[in-house]
Amino acid sequence: MLAVRSLQHLSTVVLITAYGLVLVWYTVFGASPLHRCIYAVRPTGTNNDTALVWMKMNQTLLFLGAPTHPPNGGWRNHAHISYANLIAGRVVPFQVPPDAMNRRIMNVHEAVNCLETLWYTRVRLVVVGWFLYLAFVALHQRRCMFGVVSPAHKMVAPATYLLNYAGRIVSSVFLQYPYTKITRLLCELSVQRQNLVQLFETDPVTFLYHRPAIGVIVGCELIVRFVAVGLIVGTAFISRGACAITYPLFLTITTWCFVSTIGLTELYCILRRGPAPKNADKAAAPGRSKGLSGVCGRCCSIILSGIAVRLCYIAVVAGVVLVALHYEQEIQRRLFDV
């Protein structure tokens, strides 16, 4: 059973889960029926060498040319949805439309279901990244409990291992006899691990040279973590191609908000060192600032932190204003287009 004990890892798991749920909601419920597919069209009356134009369904235009048989010998997954709104060309009563209607009638040559593309690319990558990150959390927790961890205060006591607790409960309740073999084994493991951690912190290069298996385990853990985060962040950089005309602006903004938050959270978790234990050796810092210097130091830290918070607030507001100005026409078109 996996229990995410670290608040930092739990926040990342929650963000990835929320991001995946937003994508699933948009794919299943959020997309408008008229904005699910794109069509490669050519106006009626133009030459065959005229370049095809990709566009989404427009109720002011007439789309002709639904195929009577599946393209390329078979329907793609969910491709029939794209052709359901088209009108077969033979149903139109006139063969050559008037010139005034040439630009209102479009011959469809290909259709693509953009929700299918979204489902099989972004949603799948998010799901794979979610499972990989859970695998990283499991590996990290096992290493903190049984392996070499630096700094030493990040170690978790092996006595809290679930199998040890379950064995003690079963032996005391059902067997009416104390079972301590696993506890003694874990205590011996804890002593040996503390010695290994001291050797690692003293000379990590020599330690890993003589014990390459530990380096391989730590390397696999880091690779799984970076691959998981890379898949999540990579969903924002996937080329949308012609389907970009169907995806709403809020989906792009939501994607970048989640991706940037997840990336910054992971970067903060990597760079931030955990708090030192309460019973740490106080001899390492004999000179504690007191008096006027201590007061000045605390005041300076408070002032600098306040300035940093205000700068972040100004940066966020400026970013929102720049995005609004850049997408002003697009926002107006999506708000008032019928």
Swiss-Prot record:
Transmembrane segments: 122-140, 213-233, 244-264, 302-322
Pfam family, one: Fusion_gly_K
Entry coiled-coil feature ranges: none
Extracellular membrane side: 31-121, 234-243, 323-338
Membrane topology: Multi-pass membrane protein
Location(s) in or outside the cell: Host cell membrane; Host endosome membrane; Host Golgi apparatus membrane
Residue ranges, annotated region (Interaction with UL20): 265-301
Signal peptide limits: 1-30
Cytoplasmic-facing ranges: 141-212, 265-301
Carbohydrate-modified residues: 48, 58
Renumbered residue ranges of the record's region Involved in fusion: 31-121
GO cellular component terms listed in the entry, alphabetical order: host cell endosome membrane; host cell Golgi membrane; host cell plasma membrane; membrane
Keywords: Glycoprotein, Host cell membrane, Host endosome, Host Golgi apparatus, Host membrane, Membrane, Signal, Syncytium formation induced by viral infection, Transmembrane, Transmembrane helix, Viral primary envelope fusion with host outer nuclear membrane, Viral release from host cell
GO biological process assignments: fusion of viral membrane with host outer nuclear membrane; symbiont-mediated induction of syncytium formation
Modifications made to the protein after synthesis: N-glycosylated.
Assembly: Interacts (via UL20 interaction region) with protein UL20 (via N-terminus); this interaction probably plays a role in the coordinate transport of protein UL20 and gK to the trans-Golgi network (TGN), and is required for the cell surface expression of gK.
Entry similarity comment: Belongs to the alphaherpesvirinae glycoprotein K family.
Function, in words: Glycoprotein that probably modulates membrane fusion events during secondary envelopment of cytoplasmic capsids that bud into specific trans-Golgi network (TGN)-derived membranes. Also plays a role, together with gB, in virus-induced cell-to-cell fusion (syncytia formation). Seems to block fusion of virions with infected cell membranes.
Name of the protein: Envelope glycoprotein K
Organism: Human herpesvirus 1 (strain R19) (HHV-1)
Source organism phylogeny: Viruses, Duplodnaviria, Heunggongvirae, Peploviricota, Herviviricetes
